[in-house]
A protein has these predicted regions:
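GH16 jelly-roll
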Residues: 1-230
Length: 230
């Protein structure tokens, strides 16, 4: 999706609305196209923000659940992440039976995974790239995060690309077209996955936004190619 025009394509995307996280709420009003070829995911703080409860903080999330799912392929986002402490932007995949209470605890990602293609934390110099597998229940989730030390600065106010290549044999992460990490050690998921584009509060340094302020995650495009070829 190149996010052209002024209306989000709801044939492809779902928009979370009136959903509550313990730190904030999701609102459809915080997801919109700017008419210049960008999707805006706005993080906003109302004038009546309550720091103790998180009431009055809003963000947006879009997903392709039940509208577009894919197995293997190449997944890429081009975006300017949030440039505010206390916030983070994310592009990720969720596939298989991760949310199934009976998900197999077999030490492999064959039956499902969550792939955080990128999570950007402004208070850190390096973004996060992580794979979770074996379900979310009964403390059986397994995770592997990859070192990003020495990567070029992504918090410069410019667009950057973040991608994930998923083949039957390997996972590979890329930033600005450069492979940053490869792995196959946890097994390769062979189940369809859907996409999520989201922005979040918390666990990202000191929260500095004040009532009435906002900070934007600016997305130029999200692209999926069936072939995971180099």
């Amino acid at each position: 999706d190149d996010f052209n025009g002024t209306e989000l394509n709801t044939d492809v995307w779902n928009v979370w609305d009136e959903m509550r996280d313990w730190r904030y709420s999701y609102s459809k009003d915080n997801i919109f196209l700017d008419g210049k070829g960008n999707l805006i995911n706005r993080m906003s703080v109302d004038d009546d923000y309550n720091a103790e409860t998180g009431e009055g903080r809003f963000t947006g999330t879009i997903t392709t659940l039940d509208k577009f799912e894919n197995t293997y392929g190449y997944y890429e986002i081009r975006m300017i992440p949030n440039l505010t402490s206390g916030l983070w932007s994310a592009f990720w995949l969720l596939g298989g039976d991760m949310s199934d209470e009976d998900a197999a605890d077999d030490g492999s990602a064959v039956n499902g995974f969550e792939v955080d293609i990128v999570e950007t934390y402004y208070y850190r110099e390096d973004p996060a790239q992580t794979i979770h597998w074996d379900g979310y229940y009964n403390d059986q989730t397994k995770s592997k995060s990859f070192s990003m030390a020495g990567m070029p600065q992504i918090f410069d106010g410019n667009y950057h690309t973040f991608a994930f290549r998923w083949s039957p044999d390997e996972y590979a992460f890329l930033i600005d077209g450069v492979v940053t990490n490869r792995t196959s050690e946890m097994g390769i998921c062979n189940q369809p996955a859907y996409l999520l584009v989201s922005a979040h509060y918390g666990n990202a340094g000191e929260f500095v936004m004040k009532p009435g302020e906002h900070s934007d995650m600016v997305v130029d495009y999200v692209k999926v190619y069936q072939s995971p070829a180099d």
